[in-house]
Each structure stands twice: as C-alpha cells, then as structure tokens.
Amino acid sequence: MQKNLLEYLEKTAKRIPETPAFVDECTTLTFFGLHQQSRGIGTALGRQLASCNRPVVVLAERSVQMVAALLGVLYSGNFYVPLDSQMPPQRVEALLSQLQPAALIYSTAVEALAASFSGLCPLFSIEQALDTEPDDALLSRCRQQVLDVDPAYMIFTSGSTGMPKGIIVSHRSVIDFTDWFTEAIGITGADILGNQAPFCFCLLYTSD
C-alpha cells in the first residue's frame, strides 16, 4: 500500500524518466529532473532542520521550480505551506507569525520580500538548494519519520470571516483522492493536464 505522496514521483521517474513532468513558459522539467531537483532541495532542508513533520513555507511565483520546492519539502520529512508571492507583505507576516514554520524557502524573484521575514524563521533559497547533491541516507531517515496519516500540506483559508485558518491535509487523504480521481475520470499517461489556479488555492488539488 502506498504511504507517501513521493512514491508517485519515484515510480514515474523510474518508468518514464525523460518524459516532461511539468512545463511553464520558461522551463520544461522531466520526471527524472524533477526527482533529482526535489531530492536536492529535500537534502538541503533536511541537513538544516532539526525535526520532521513541521510546516515549511514555500514563497515563490507559480513555476516548475515551485513544484520542485513543494516536493523537496516532503523529501525533508516536513509538510509544505504554499503562500502567494502576490500577497501583501503584512498578510504574509501575519500568517508566518501564526504558523511559526520551521523554515521558509523562496525563489530569487521574491528574495527581497522573503528577506523581510528573516526574523520569523530560517530562510532558504530554492536556487541555492537546487545545487545540493542528494543524500540518499539522509532522505531515507527523513522518510522513516513520516506516516501516511501525517500532514502533506497546509492551505490557508481566505480569511473572509476573520483570521485565515490553516487546513491540514495528510498523505493518506491525497493518495486516496488521487487514486479515486484518476480512475473515475480515466486519466492516463497520455493526458496533458493544465493548471491556472494559484498553488495556495485549494482548488488546485482537486481540479487539475
């Protein structure tokens, strides 16, 4: 039985490594490349973070690189919290103060914004983390700390009725939904899926 979302990536990277996994206006990333990049990011985070199953904020523009960062957080044994880089800085600061994340990983495009939060949590650059050589032993130890009922990600509500609330979703919930959804819709490896929703919007995880 599948227990971790990363198993989807790992199985696919072995089966069709050179097939494009994600494409944006600037970059095409194969499943092999996505696997390598996310493991490198996971290694960089895992070496610096003392514990697992903690929230790690991902602050970046919507891109292939952000996908690698989200998966990299999972490889580090933690769960990701995507925030919209277009949010007002005051809102981001309020969410960080509420969440108290283990770290924030950001892209170069939002480096100045991320730097303003340096007093709230450790900061990691996605671009620098991408240069990290994956450490299989470290990644294995991180994986062993995570159960299928542990969080995979957290999405904040809009806060229209007050302070935004964090909704936690486990690996098991996403696995069960994904297996049902792909069978019900009849998605195959030949299909190409598009996404227009921000990564911090919950519709992204149910309507691709």
Outline where the language-model segments fall.
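Short catalytic-loop micro-motif centered on adjacent basic/acidic residues
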Residues: 82, 194-195
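Gly/Ser/Thr-rich phosphate-binding loops and adjoining beta-strand/alpha-helix segments
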Residues: 55, 190-194
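Residue-level detector of conserved catalytic or cofactor/ligand-binding positions
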Residues: 202-208
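Short glycine/serine/threonine-enriched helix-capping/active-site loop
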Residues: 69, 195-196
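Conserved N-terminal segment of class I S-adenosyl-L-methionine
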Residues: 177-181
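Carrier-protein-dependent adenylate-forming modules in NRPS/ANL systems
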Residues: 1-175, 185-186, 208
